[in-house]
Amino acid sequence: MSEPAAYIAPFRDLLPPNARLLVQAGAGDGGLARAYRKLYPASGLMVVEADPALAAQAREYADRVYQADLDSVSAAFYQQLAWADGWYFDATLEQCQQPGRVLQQVGQVMPVDTCIIARIANRSHWQAPETPPQHQWDLAGMLTLFAGSGLRVISGILLNPGPLPAEVEARLREQAGGDDSMLAALVEATQPSHYLIKAVPER
Amino acid sequence: MNPTPPFYCIAHAPFNWKMPDFMTMVGSGDYVPETGLAMSQLLSPEEALSNRYLGEYVALFEIRRRLIAEQAEGFVGFCHYRRFALTDPIGVLHQFNYHAHPDMLAKVRPEHFYGDGQTPIVPISVTWAGSVLQQYEACVTGRDLLMFFGDAIDCGVITNLEAANFLSGKAFIPAPTVAFIPVQWFVEIIHDLELVASRYYRHHYVYREGYADRSIAFCCERLQAFLLAKRIAAWGQDKVIQRPLVLLGDTYPNL
């Protein structure tokens, strides 16, 4: 995982300003929620988390916590959150069993001015995670996922926690075989640890 | 050039005169015109009746989606059943508008509605005694306009400075929907209005009695006027046909 300070600021800045209600899909350490609350103290945050222990932790920073699994809740669950100003997934979308279905259900209840922000691990990152998530995508796969869920990606940010190690860069150079544009494409694909994706309903 | 660009005429109730055949009638609320589009048939009952506070904008949001689905290009025109922006106005100029009897509509040729098909035709900008905000407050409730423009800033539709300058300025284009403009302008402007209206409804909408309940429509009109004026300025003020609106009424002169 990248350093919290490195991704929290751009993530927070992509979230809708001064939200009445934000929905956080999956519990985290609360760093992002606290950073957002510092800017917008009157905003409400609801966390949806299936794991009882993680849900209990989330109560430390969230106004409300639903212990529920987004993969299996009914359409009525999503409908009751139709008044949320935005949803965000902090490296949790790739942990859903059916991420496309979850996105689709959120997208169906979202008002037109709201958005989904997701920080998603890059499958092509040079360093494979110790515990791979349920799903792994490269950028093209992420864009396909959102488009297939009725959502339009309106912005994206590469999260680069640091430069490539020398040996990784040397390997990519070899792979590129002297082709500079291919080398640039390989570096661009493998350097980001995550992508920050902002999407809105396709309506 | 397409000889008959898409042209929509919006009405919320039946009326006693006939609009030109090239226009697509659009019925807002529960009004179902004999031909054309009826919001009550295209949308859910709740959505169609949201014209209570959104006015004609419910129909405009839907038309925008249709234009995108049709991959429409070029220009698109809009009028209300009794309000038009014409290249050659009819009737008698009274204050900021022309007043004309509905029978005079028979004298209006299609090209008076859409000109050469590639030049924007828009209502004139009207200057008021006070600021835009004061003029709004004099008619309804200033708080609504302030909140609406705050939401427009939060949605990224306008900047703080643009909002401050517009609300403290003394002029805007009334009935900015009534225009013949590039499809792209319409799609972009209506998209922005829908974002702001959606956020405003969730965050700041307050029910008001009677006519004043159309607060979101009134606020949309001001923001639309600003967004249209911005595009006119970029296009070139001298390359746009700006005319006083023509209003029809049974008691108006029949020349």
Predicted regions, residues:
Chain B
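ER/Golgi luminal nucleotide-sugar-dependent glycosyltransferases, focusing on the catalytic module
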Residues: 1-255
